[in-house]
Regions:
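Short basic/hydrophobic patches in alpha-helices and adjacent helix-turn junctions
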Residues: 53-57, 70-73
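Winged helix-turn-helix DNA-binding recognition segment
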Residues: 59-64
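An amphipathic alpha-helical micro-motif enriched in hydrophobic residues
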Residues: 30-41, 65-74
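Acidic, glycine/proline-rich low-complexity segments that act as flexible tails and inter-domain linkers
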Residues: 1-31, 39-41, 45-56, 80-104
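C-terminal structural segments of small proteins and small subunits
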Residues: 65-89
């Protein structure tokens, strides 16, 4: 018997609808999402959830830095610093998932 996952299912549905109805290229879409995550002080899990699609769309570390620089005057330095920390925690999560025994 499968455990119901209504919250996860809803999140997947709204993300799919966003992608389906957007006219942006995958790269532009992921840059916009990154800017929004910085603006709302998204938690590390949000960055982690978007890491795969971001990498697949060609987003680079320089792109991430450029977006953070671009939004800093609008969202404030505290949110940009928080985003940097949350990105680092997301990276740590990804490493832990990829190598749970820490053998890499």
């Amino acid at each position: 018997m499968t455990t119901p996952t209504p919250v996860l299912d809803t999140l997947l549905d709204i993300n799919s609808a966003s992608i389906e109805h957007s006219q942006l290229s995958p790269r532009e879409l992921m840059l916009a999402r990154l800017a929004a995550m910085v603006a709302v002080d998204a938690p590390p899990a949000s960055y982690l959830a978007n890491a795969g699609p971001s990498a697949a769309s060609g987003i680079t570390q320089q792109d991430v830095q450029d977006v953070m620089i671009a939004v800093a005057p609008l969202v404030g330095t505290a949110k940009v610093v928080s985003a940097g920390g949350n990105l680092m925690r997301a990276l740590d999560m990804a490493i832990t998932v990829a190598d749970p025994d820490g053998m890499a």
